[in-house]
């Protein structure tokens, strides 16, 4: 694509945003601006310089917009435990819920309205081009049929269905690329998963397993993390992204072994930077947007509400205007937006979130040419390209470059 065409298309998208939202100044719904690269580097380390590109990322870089899904036992609690509040997916940590009680909570997990085909259809209506679904979050509960650990949706709940498997199949039927999230270094169900936060015991299960010094990450890695990743690769052949989190105590050798294993079973699969130790194919700033262009491929993961998992009291979702502004801002800097929804305990998406995303989808139906398949100009944030009489295109106003 010629750079001037990219600039014109982004100008048309910006004009459409004025019609959609009414106000010219950017609004970000509480998303932090300008700290993306720094934040990602502090948590996970920058990608190693000079490492050749491992896989073809063009489809992902053309997509620019994906759906992130967080669902687990925390969904049932909905941000409240025995009258006390707790932050969505962190309800177990916030309230120090014992493992035994979480296993009882699994008996209440029964999202009978779950329809994988409708989830994929909703993403398509929203203009999203790929889906990443949580397969295991920090509570250690697997959303797929895991032979190596019975604490999973098929064996431990009355629902008894493989949510990852059904969603993977629906994505394949509808031509939607599919990826899975996996919490690599944090597991509150496992006695060997130590804290990977700055302070000892900071985000590990120190109420059931108080002796941090007795915990051995390599035992957990060999017993659960590596076997479950292998299960995902073998059971769901259309996985195209493995989206790790909390690499924590992963050694360089363990991170590399994980990458080698994925490459063996799924050669084209993309891997994010949270596999740890400066490895991976793209960086993943969280709840932030880059302050400028980045030489590494990058993707901002951002919630549409206040938390990653479903919360009963979360009724304020980012408006269509804010989502569209975030998307165009990110695309103008060469990134992707992975927008998160927390499905309800019944297996549906919150109605207000769906309505807002449908509106963004309609906007993309008209303006998608300015988003999909684009690449950034040498600088971002230019104003409209000026058209001269006779059809000749004039240069942008240098005073209007941010």
Language-model region placement:
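Residues at the start of alpha-helices and the adjacent loop-to-helix junctions
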Residues: 6-8, 18, 115, 163
């Amino acid at each position: 694509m010629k750079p001037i065409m990219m600039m014109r298309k982004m100008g048309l998208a910006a004009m459409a945003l004025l019609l959609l939202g009414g106000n010219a100044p950017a609004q970000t719904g509480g998303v932090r601006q300008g700290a993306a690269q720094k934040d990602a580097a502090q948590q996970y380390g920058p990608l190693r310089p000079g490492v050749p590109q491992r896989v073809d990322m063009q489809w992902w870089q053309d997509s620019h917009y994906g759906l992130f899904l967080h669902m687990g036992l925390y969904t049932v609690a909905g941000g409240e435990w025995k009258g006390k509040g707790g932050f969505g997916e962190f309800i177990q940590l916030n309230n120090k819920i014992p493992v035994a009680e979480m296993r009882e909570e699994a008996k209440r997990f029964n999202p009978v309205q779950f329809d994988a085909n409708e989830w994929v259809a909703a993403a398509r209506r929203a203009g999203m081009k790929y889906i990443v679904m949580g397969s295991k979050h920090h509570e250690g509960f697997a959303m797929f049929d895991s032979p190596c650990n019975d604490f999973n949706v098929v064996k431990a709940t009355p629902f008894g269905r493989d949510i990852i498997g059904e969603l993977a199949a629906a994505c394949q039927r509808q031509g939607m690329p599919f990826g899975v999230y996996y919490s690599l270094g944090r597991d509150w169900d496992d006695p060997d998963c130590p804290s990977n936060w700055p302070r000892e015991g900071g985000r590990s299960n120190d109420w059931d397993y108080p002796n941090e010094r007795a915990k051995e990450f390599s035992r957990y890695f060999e017993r659960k993390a590596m076997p479950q990743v292998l299960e995902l690769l073998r059971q769901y052949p259309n996985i195209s992204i493995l989206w790790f989190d909390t690499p924590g105590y992963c050694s360089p050798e363990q991170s590399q072994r994980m990458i080698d294993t994925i490459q063996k079973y799924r050669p084209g699969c993309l891997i994010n930077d949270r596999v740890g130790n400066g490895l991976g194919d793209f960086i993943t700033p969280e709840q932030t947007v880059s302050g400028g262009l980045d030489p590494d491929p990058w993707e901002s993961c951002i919630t549409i509400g206040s938390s990653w998992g479903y919360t009963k009291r979360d009724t304020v979702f980012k408006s269509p205007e804010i989502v569209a502004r975030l998307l165009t801002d990110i695309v103008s800097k060469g990134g992707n937006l992975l927008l998160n929804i927390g499905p309800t305990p019944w297996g549906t998406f919150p109605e207000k979130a769906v309505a807002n995303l449908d509106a963004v989808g309609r906007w993309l139906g008209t303006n998608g040419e300015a988003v999909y398949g684009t690449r950034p100009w040498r600088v971002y944030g230019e104003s409209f390209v000026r058209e001269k009489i006779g059809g000749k295109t004039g240069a942008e106003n240098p005073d209007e470059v941010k």
